[in-house]
Amino acid sequence: MVAELEFEKPLIELRKKISELKEFMKSTDVDLSSEIEKLEARLAKLENDIYANLTPWDRVQIARHPNRPTTLDYIERLFTHFLECHGDRCFGDDEAIVGGIAKYDGLPVTVIGHQRGKDTKENIRRNFGMPHPEGYRKALRLMKQAEKFQRPIICFIDTKGAYPGKAAEERGQSEAIARNLFEMAGLTVPIVCIVIGEGGSGGALALGVGNHIHMLENSTYSVISPEGAAAILWKDASLAQRAAETMKITANDLKELGVIDEIIPEVRGGAHRDVDQQAAEIDKVLKRSLKQLLKLDGETLVQQRYEKFKQIGQFAFSRDDIWVR
């Protein structure tokens, strides 16, 4: 059963009514097809109205949906011969990050991504998709291996952020993230990054230094969660909706700002409504990206990545915006 989100509540009653009428028609000789058709038309219009006018906070809710597809869901549908690799060769294996070797359309690749759980037990095992330092070091080990064997790297980003616990800090969380940023910038193989859910802070960016960066239509990418921003700016986490409107965290915002390259369309209602179709949409963009990047040599890939990130964070203003005392 797919959980309904807060903004989808107006749809629930209509769907329930349609279901009840269909069941009643099955169990009796009464023909209710015309009434059902009218309700279905009304439902379709309401769905169009809601999903065509999603607010940033609505998209945050979709990105956090408990049934939203994870990295492993996409690996299963997009890649063959996936062999998961474990451990950072230093401390241990962090299950909040999965990664390994696979084939994509016959091409050997390295695929890495954050991994949330599907239920409480798995979320605890995977630390709710919030990696420890050993997770990032595992990812870096796989990236360096990919460079050695000249395999393209594909990263799926989906985390609230790096785990901020005491043990993680003791084992060098900030150093692990910084090291990934530094090393990814200089890798001589193509890197394609796709934000599939939440892209939270440095924990997301540690897998996000790519030649091409794409986002699913209802994913988010930001330096902090809306709740965290609201707590800092206004001392009230309940103002998260207001923060989401202000922070420019949606795919549309980030495409306009030049942070990402392409928005991957989602099925109506979110990726969790049809995982196979969503994987097919990702497949189209991923094929296109790799086709472009595989034409470039290592030096060009590094330079392109450098130029891309150099542009992020620049701003422009007109003479009228300058106030002179």
Swiss-Prot record:
Reactions mediated catalytically: N(6)-carboxybiotinyl-L-lysyl-[protein] + acetyl-CoA = N(6)-biotinyl-L-lysyl-[protein] + malonyl-CoA
* Protein location: Cytoplasm
GO terms of biological process kind: fatty acid biosynthetic process; malonyl-CoA biosynthetic process
Q: Domain CoA carboxyltransferase C-terminal: where?
A: 35-292
Q: Which Pfam families match?
A: ACCA (PF03255)
**Enzyme Commission code(s) on record:** 2.1.3.15
Q: In which pathway does it act?
A: Lipid metabolism; malonyl-CoA biosynthesis; malonyl-CoA from acetyl-CoA: step 1/1
Query: What does the subunit comment say?
Result: Acetyl-CoA carboxylase is a heterohexamer composed of biotin carboxyl carrier protein (AccB), biotin carboxylase (AccC) and two subunits each of ACCase subunit alpha (AccA) and ACCase subunit beta (AccD).
Q: What is this protein called?
A: Acetyl-coenzyme A carboxylase carboxyl transferase subunit alpha
Species of origin reads Geobacillus sp. (strain WCH70)
Organism lineage reads as:
Bacteria, Bacillati, Bacillota, Bacilli, Bacillales
